[in-house]
């Protein structure tokens, strides 16, 4: 008797959208990560020499609105398995900033050549996570509509100081009609690990913003006559304090071009 055995083909499942994004950036693709890999948490990067890690950790504890820690590496390791099994901090961000003595000296798409054995990576929550919740409620988000980076501004809101780290909070801005602004407060309050509720609504000059059409980071977006600007604490704040602290060396992401993780946005909600 002849027994025919059907060949079984094992299909390799498609990688997660978050991993697909990281692989694309690892391969050299560059662009804003707003709206990329819907449903997955994105993070801001602050990579510092170990001698400054304790003080920066304390700075984040004192300033949880702009600096909510969602991941931290071991000294010298470019991997944070809790955020992605194959994630490589050195290659998986669209664009980085390399800092020396508080100034940006390079903006590469790969920092392998800059990597050192004494570096510690902090990954901080990003407002792109709560944007998904806003979109699910049918609320328009201007910078996504216009395919530009979210506008970000240095303010006169002082951060708590820790070691060499001190300076003003950076905020991101999204314009909404007043009723939608109230709803945005309610929705984003559920996401304290990704900046939570806004820190300010309305009059930009009250928090030290002289011209809303000229953001310090990102791209300007129009605010209609029937809208108000709504400001959230922003994970670019560490870049402002790194500049002020004049650290001899540091690496961050380029504003608006984040680390895409395998964490789910829904896990960031508290209620």
Swiss-Prot record:
GO MF annotations, alphabetized: lyase activity
Coiled-coil region(s): none
Q: Where are the transmembrane segments?
A: none
Keyword annotations for this protein? Lyase
InterPro entries with a match to the protein in the record: D-Glu_cyclase, Putative_hydro-lyase, UPF0317
Q: What class of enzyme is it?
A: lyase
Reported EC number(s) for this entry are: 4.2.1.-
Q: Please give the NCBIfam families that the UniProt record associates with this protein.
A: PRK05463.1
Write out the similarity annotation.
Belongs to the D-glutamate cyclase family.
Q: What is this protein called?
A: Putative hydro-lyase blr2921
